[in-house]
Amino acid sequence: MQFTEPDPLDFSNHDGYVSLFDGASLKGWDGNPKFWRVEDGAIVGEATPKNPCGNTYLVYRDMKAKDFTLKFEMKIVGSGGSGFQYRSQTGIPWLVPISPAVISNTGPVNLDWMMTGPQADFWPSQIYSGQFYSENTPMRIIAWRGQVVESFGDDSKRLMGAIGDRKGLGELVKNDDWNQYTVIARGGTFIHIMNGQLMAVLVDDDPNSSNNQPGLFGIELESITQLYVRNIWVKKLN
């Protein structure tokens, strides 16, 4: 019997995938038009000091999924933060107070544009990109970049192993440039990969956890920044 290596990673191979973004419009997406637009084949989210957003989300309404492989490219210009939501819900009351400046700019919070659930984090910061974040829940950061974590919903979390040095892995994240991001969700297992490098793994064994429910995809815009996302593809299993 001969041992063989797996086929090499080909980020541009979309066999078995469906596209969530047509490259020209926000068809299927739902968000505050003050912050979201399409430009040069990419979804652009932008918040400025004169147009602050706090947390706001562009929600993909045309698909819900539980088990899938998601691929996309993401770039941030500026100091704010972002992430890609998955298995997420809308309409849930927001836990963190919204600043008066944001309310003055946007009006009362529209919970249809606020997402609760798992997030693949992406920041220009060397700390957060690649980690597993549970948005708008008490769990928050569950698996930091470089960690393999086992959890049971919001009751417990335990470090099971290390993928690598958090700072060293962060040096693989490109600032002001495109990054390839892959998210794999199978049952209670979540895998985040950036630029071909494993960044974080979470195993959530609580079947009732908000992490383990089917839900929506979406993009977060947080703080003052410019965010670009393109080439969004999903291979949905269920």
Locate predicted features.
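Carbohydrate-interacting regions of secretory-pathway proteins
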Residues: 1-238
